[in-house]
A protein has these predicted regions:
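Terminal interaction helix/tail motif
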Residues: 95-136, 141
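Charged, amphipathic alpha-helical coiled-coil/dimerization segments
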Residues: 62-112
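Short alpha-helical "packing" element that flanks the helix-turn-helix/winged-helix DNA-binding module
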Residues: 25-29
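Canonical helix-turn-helix DNA-binding module
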Residues: 38-80
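Short, locally clustered residues in the helix-turn-helix/winged-helix DNA-binding domain
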Residues: 30-37, 97
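N-terminal leader segment of winged-helix/HTH proteins
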Residues: 1-19
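Long, low-complexity, charge-rich intrinsically disordered regions
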Residues: 134, 139-175
C-alpha cells in the first residue's frame, strides 16, 4: 500500500514543479490557502507539513519572494507572524493546486471511497506519530452554529461562514 500512496504523492507533487514551485513550497502554499486565520503561523505550517522550522522558514521566505504570500504581524504581539496569500498566490492555487477532475481524474464514487479509506489511514499515522490532525473547523467539537452565526467556543470568537471549511490547528474532532 505504501508504494501506491508514495506514487500518488509524487504525481501530485510533480505538477507543482511545472509552476516554478518545489513540492514543499506547493504544499505550504496549499496549506495556507486552506488554513483559517488562526492557523497560518510558521510553526503551524511546520506542524502540518511535519517539517522542521528551518525548512518551513526558508520555504515561506521563497514564497514571499515569489510574491505568493505576505507576512502579517499581530497588532497585539509584534513578534507573532502569520501569512496570507497574495492575489497572485490565490490565482496560482485556484488554477493549479485544486481537487479538480483534471488534477484528480476519478469518479465521485471512487473519490469518496478513497477519501474515506485514506482518512482512516491518515488518522492511524497521525496517532502513531503523536501529530495534530488539523481537521476542518465545521467538524470540531467547539464549532457552534446558531442560525446563520458561527462561533468557536475554544477561542471565544465569532467565525465567518467561509471559515467552517478551513483547516484549523486547534481542531478537535466532535464526538
Amino acid at each position: 500500500m505504501m508504494w501506491l500512496i508514495e506514487r500518488m504523492a509524487r504525481l501530485l507533487a510533480s505538477e507543482a514543479w511545472t509552476e516554478g514551485l518545489n513540492p514543499t513550497q506547493a504544499a505550504a502554499l496549499q496549506y495556507l490557502a486552506r488554513a483559517n486565520r488562526f492557523s497560518r503561523s510558521p510553526s503551524h505550517v511546520a506542524d502540518y507539513l511535519l517539517a522542521t522550522r528551518g525548512t518551513v522558514s526558508q520555504t515561506l521566505k521563497a514564497l514571499q519572494q515569489k510574491g505568493l504570500i505576505a507576512e502579517q504581524r499581530s497588532d497585539a504581539d509584534r513578534r507573532s507572524i502569520s501569512y496570507d496569500l497574495t492575489d497572485d498566490g490565490h490565482a496560482l492555487v485556484k488554477e493549479y493546486v485544486t481537487d479538480s477532475p483534471t488534477t484528480f481524474p476519478v469518479t465521485d464514487d471512487l473519490a469518496d471511497a478513497a477519501s474515506e479509506n485514506l482518512s482512516a489511514v491518515m488518522q492511524e499515522w497521525l496517532t502513531a506519530r503523536n501529530a495534530r490532525p488539523f481537521g476542518l473547523c465545521r467538524n470540531c467539537q467547539y464549532h457552534q452554529v446558531s442560525g446563520k452565526k458561527r462561533h468557536c467556543a475554544l477561542l471565544a470568537v465569532d467565525l465567518a461562514p467561509s471559515e467552517a471549511d478551513k483547516i484549523c490547528f486547534e481542531q478537535q474532532a466532535a464526538p
